């Protein structure tokens, strides 16, 4: 039984190495996500490009974060979402 399992594994590995399993032709590598430049005014939250704090950001940056992500700054309260 072990011999059969070993032979099946080796045969499937050989097919993958030869490229017989993938019939779609050349597959290019997955591109990296674009680099997000940090905004001035504080640390950056994960994957969103908006500062964690509302302090020190411009009105246009605050409006952009609010419209794109629903993270809206309120006077004296910080982010709402």
UniProtKB/Swiss-Prot annotation:
The modification Pyrrolidone carboxylic acid is found at residue 20. It is found in: Cytoplasmic granule. GO terms for cellular component: cytoplasm. Residues 1-19 form the signal peptide. The modification Serine amide is found at residue 80. Disulfide bonds join 50-65, 54-72, 66-73. GO terms for molecular function: chitin binding. Antibacterial and antifungal activity. Presents chitin-binding activity. Belongs to the penaeidin family. This is Penaeidin-3j.
């Amino acid at each position: 039984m072990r011999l059969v399992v070993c032979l099946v594994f080796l045969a499937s590995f050989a097919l993958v190495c030869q490229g017989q399993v993938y019939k779609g032709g050349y597959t290019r590598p997955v591109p990296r996500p674009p680099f997000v430049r940090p905004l001035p005014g504080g640390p950056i939250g994960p994957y969103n490009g908006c500062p964690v704090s509302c302090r020190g950001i411009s009105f246009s940056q605050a409006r952009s974060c609010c419209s794109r992500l629903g993270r809206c700054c309120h006077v004296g309260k910080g982010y709402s979402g």
